[in-house]
Amino acid sequence: MSRVTSGPATAKRHKSVIKKAKGYYGRRKNTFRVAVQAVEKAGQYAYRDRRAKKRNFRALWIQRINAGARQHEMSYSVFMNGLTKAGIEVDRKVLADIAMHEPDAFKALVDQARAALG
């Protein structure tokens, strides 16, 4: 009995890989052997960058909070220390949003942090 190379399972797997490679440039989008490599590498990048995304956003929030705090003559580290001592538990994501969109509310937080530091 001869070996079957074009069975339903193989066709389904090939179709799945080609579908995932849609939008790629050159032979990567329509040649199975090349598409498999491209899709595999894309998965590696996606896995890595899902983790990097968390670090990047935290860094962005810290930069925004620091910029907002420095407008009121206070550094990021001193501001965060003041918030901790004041018992204000607001995460960096929310603080960054307040610093950008509600400067008056952020100034109130800076004043509370300054008061807690003494």
Curated annotation (Swiss-Prot):
Q: GO CC: one term?
A: ribosome
Q: Which PROSITE patterns match?
A: RIBOSOMAL_L20
Any one GO MF annotation of this record? structural constituent of ribosome
What GO biological process term is on the record, naming one? Answer: ribosomal large subunit assembly
Q: Please provide the record's keywords in A-Z order.
A: Ribonucleoprotein, Ribosomal protein, RNA-binding, rRNA-binding
Its annotated function is as follows: Binds directly to 23S ribosomal RNA and is necessary for the in vitro assembly process of the 50S ribosomal subunit. It is not involved in the protein synthesizing functions of that subunit.
Q: Which family is it part of?
A: Belongs to the bacterial ribosomal protein bL20 family.
Q: What is this protein called?
A: Large ribosomal subunit protein bL20
Instruction: Provide the species name.
Output: Maricaulis maris (strain MCS10)
Ranked from the top, the taxonomy reads: Bacteria, Pseudomonadati, Pseudomonadota, Alphaproteobacteria, Maricaulales
This protein's encoding gene: rplT
